[in-house]
């Protein structure tokens, strides 16, 4: 036969201040639970941390610095530009002026001209940024580079 017992919570209703939790305050807040949330992960809950969350502490990965937040700098080498210059002219994205193919990299969405590769034809390149080697190679081939964004030295002088 099933023994009918009253539940402890019903039995203690209205009887005592602590409802069998011992001293007043033992059942308050989170003192008996080891703290709220992630409290104690490096102290009294360390065994839990190393078992279930081993990567909780320490650094991981690498965030490369950006020139400006949110700006991805797209680049092109002078060798690549020399290869596609005639194609850009045929598509109408570049024009010919004084025997030079004029390419505006800013309009093409390219931010910087770099110096890898060879330049076989004279080019006139308009770009926000360019490396010294890129400028040197284009000028040696009989072209010119117009840098639209001022360098730090130029900005400090003016």
From Swiss-Prot:
Pfam families: Ribosomal_L27A (PF00828). The gene is rpl15. Part of the 50S ribosomal subunit. This is Large ribosomal subunit protein uL15. Signal peptide: none annotated. It comes from the Archaea. PANTHER family: 60S RIBOSOMAL PROTEIN L27A, LARGE RIBOSOMAL SUBUNIT PROTEIN UL15. GO terms for cellular component: cytosolic large ribosomal subunit. GO terms for biological process: translation. SUPFAM superfamilies: Ribosomal proteins L15p and L18e. It comes from Aeropyrum pernix (strain ATCC 700893 / DSM 11879 / JCM 9820 / NBRC 100138 / K1). HAMAP family: Ribosomal_uL15 (MF_01341). Belongs to the universal ribosomal protein uL15 family.
